[in-house]
């Protein structure tokens, strides 16, 4: 049977734990509020930029033959301004720690589902994603990158971009913020090729200034990195929101358990008081 002393220790522990949870929840909320507006504003802008990237790349392909004739090139792969390896890369942006609820696992499930349908190389950001991937023992060429959960590391981003830009097709799997209580897994193709559900409709014809080559070079080098950086910001925002919700849930559970412990301790105290009263009355009768 649980003693009053044990219940007192548990109550003290739960009180401390609740304070810690509320503190971390407040930190997550502050960080989320700090980047929320900028991320959401950038989201719409870069979605449009990515769509333009796709259209430019499609137009570029349709004009390849003409460009090959002009430059007397027989191999079309030489028309790209970055040497690519012809492979597909799956990038999973995870986390280094827990307390993010189920969103990391849900994103991982989408990532693995796509990887199994069409095998390719893998790049993982974050220790948690690496641990999950190793546990499942999936065989795929893998590159792991250390990356912080709560800030943008520009040097690390540059290192990652230098690795992933070599691939013909780059799919990034990450967490997206919908609202404070809802986050969802999402995949973005950052290499300028539309995903299956993004295709459709007639392709517009464009005039390119100063030239098609210059514009493609700009998109392949500069816009590629910007779109990838946005996916990291999106993941960061979604994880802050998920952590806030997870900590709030844990805090409420701690509050409920603390209330139960206090009530149990009071009940034991009443039982002890009643027992002492009965013993007192019994001893008084013996003296009469």
Q: Where are the regions a protein language model picked out?
A:
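C-terminal beta-strand-loop-alpha-helix "lid" module of Rossmann-like NAD(P)-dependent dehydrogenases
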Residues: 1-288
């Amino acid at each position: 049977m649980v003693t009053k002393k044990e219940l007192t220790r548990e109550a003290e522990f739960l009180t401390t734990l609740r304070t810690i949870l509320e503190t971390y929840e407040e930190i997550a909320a502050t960080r989320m509020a700090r980047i929320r507006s900028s991320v959401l504003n950038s989201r719409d802008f870069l979605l449009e930029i990515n769509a333009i990237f796709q259209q430019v790349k499609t137009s570029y392909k349709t004009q390849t033959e003409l460009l090959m004739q002009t430059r007397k090139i027989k191999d079309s792969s030489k028309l790209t301004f970055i040497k690519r390896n012809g492979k597909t890369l799956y990038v999973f942006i995870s986390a280094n720690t827990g307390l993010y609820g189920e969103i990391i696992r849900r994103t991982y499930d989408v990532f693995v589902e796509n990887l199994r349908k069409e095998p390719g190389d893998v790049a993982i950001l974050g220790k948690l994603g690496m641990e999950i991937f190793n546990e499942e023992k999936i065989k795929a060429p893998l590159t792991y990158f250390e990356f912080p959960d709560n800030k943008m590391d520009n040097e690390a981003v540059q290192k990652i971009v230098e690795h992933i830009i070599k691939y013909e097709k780059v799919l990034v799997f990450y967490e997206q913020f919908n609202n404070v209580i809802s986050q969802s897994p999402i995949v973005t193709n950052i290499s300028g090729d539309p995903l299956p559900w993004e295709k459709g409709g007639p392709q517009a014809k464009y005039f390119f200034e100063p030239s098609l080559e210059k514009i493609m070079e700009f998109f392949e080098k500069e816009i590629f990195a910007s779109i990838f950086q946005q996916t990291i910001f999106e993941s960061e925002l979604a994880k802050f929101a998920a952590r806030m919700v997870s900590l709030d849930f844990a805090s409420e559970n701690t509050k409920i358990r603390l209330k139960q412990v206090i009530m149990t301790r009071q009940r034991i105290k009443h039982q002890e008081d009643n027992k002492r009263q009965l013993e007192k009355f019994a001893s008084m009768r013996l003296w009469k």
